[in-house]
From Swiss-Prot:
Record's protein name: Glutamyl-tRNA(Gln) amidotransferase subunit A
GO terms, molecular function: ATP binding; glutaminyl-tRNA synthase (glutamine-hydrolyzing) activity
Recorded family membership: Belongs to the amidase family. GatA subfamily.
Residues of the active site: 80, 155, 179
Annotated GO biological process: translation
UniProt keyword Ribonucleoprotein present: no
Keywords, alphabetical: ATP-binding, Ligase, Nucleotide-binding, Protein biosynthesis
Gene3D superfamilies in alphabetical order: Amidase signature (AS) domain
Natural source organism: Mycobacteroides abscessus (strain ATCC 19977 / DSM 44196 / CCUG 20993 / CIP 104536 / JCM 13569 / NCTC 13031 / TMC 1543 / L948) (Mycobacterium abscessus)
Catalytic activity field: L-glutamyl-tRNA(Gln) + L-glutamine + ATP + H2O = L-glutaminyl-tRNA(Gln) + L-glutamate + ADP + phosphate + H(+)
Disulfide bonds: none
InterPro entries named among the record's database cross-references: Amidase, Amidase_CS, Amidase_dom, AS_sf, GatA
GO cellular component: glutamyl-tRNA(Gln) amidotransferase complex
Amino acid sequence: MTDLIRQDAAALAALIHSGEVSSVEVTRAHLDQIASTDETYRAFLHVAGEQALAAAKDVDDAIAAGSVPSGLAGVPLALKDVFTTRDMPTTCGSKILENWVPPYDATVTARLRGAGIPILGKTNMDEFAMGSSTENSAYGPTRNPWDVERVPGGSGGGSAAALAAFQAPLAIGTDTGGSIRQPAALTATVGVKPTYGTVSRFGLVACASSLDQGGPCARTVLDTALLHQVIAGHDPRDSTSVDEPVPDVVAAARAGASGDLKGVRVGVVTQLRGDGYQPGVMASFDAAVEQLTALGADVVEVSCPHFEYALPAYYLILPSEVSSNLARFDAMRYGMRVGDDGTHSAEEVMALTRAAGFGPEVKRRIMIGTYALSAGYYDAYYGRAQKVRTLIKRDLERAYEQVDVLVTPATPTTAFRLGEKVDDPLAMYQFDLCTLPLNLAGHCGMSVPSGLSADDGLPVGLQIMAPALADDRLYRVGAAYETARGALPAAL
């Protein structure tokens, strides 16, 4: 069983589809690992053992009958608790949705089920995906398997920790300003933020609608590509869904694994390096750039001057959208309901419920957003931030006229200690410095492990960025780099 949980998803799929092992065996092995380790790591908010084993048996029966539902059929997965699931709770890490079981599946959930992928359970996250450490979860923080006194990143730290702790071979996250890529960097896993609109947001509980994007996470680039292919594609139920062909990311990953990057133009973003970055992170990044050069890539410096303003623009746009989206949690139709004893008006019930149900970071962002959208301040704050967003997108478009992909460190430092930044929101926000420009532009990005920092022995991530609808470039470059880098130590 120990051997099974350490296999990558592609290898597990091959074993299951050939009949050497059953999906039930693989799923049970991962459920056993969750049972024996999650008291330490707290990666899961809900474990759906019975449902996962039933789904695994269905796959085994289909294979016995000569039918394989998909390339990943039978390989179990951990799902971030922000996607609706009709048969298990969806809490978004918040007390206001405690024990809420939605009446429908998100499109991503439905596509996973349709592909025969057993869902092991729902993973921990910062409340409503607001945070960079998973410390904002109403159900307690997730701990990093590399060092249990440190954070696994956020908001999707549960999914990344589950991968690093061998509790799951695959996971799904969401990325609003780096919530897939940043935890991947801190846990030595692979995480991809797809092009905005290429993975359906139907059934994804919204944080910031123009920024949120679901995406795949795994321990290898190929596994991530295989999962990406399952969840991507147009969805008429999502008004922001892009009706364009999805690039063949699996073929790109397989091609990249050959290690040849001749003719690929790589840009190093000048603004995302230097002061404020941990020396060990920069040393790892510089070594990764040298490796890309050795693989045949043409590496040049690229300037994106408006990245300097990305952080303040993001933290005006995001809270503004949060303020609007979270207004729907009014205690009228579902979720927590406080003060409903006949002595309070509907408005009082709403106020009492929101006061008790939302955590401090969510309240902070609602207040900032409400202020930024208020009459007299809209143009000065939200309107100006949207103009900066346009300038950042133009910076990237100009950069891609010169290069095929851009590379940066995925995070300024390695994983920080639990509690270190909780009382300093600005320091926490600055941790997203490298990742959030991509979300403002709607482009795609990947974090792939680039080794361990010489400073503290903790994981470091290389961020690869590409234009909209060029997700295949991420996989080609990421797989080539992964092959050249070689195997890394595991957290456990």
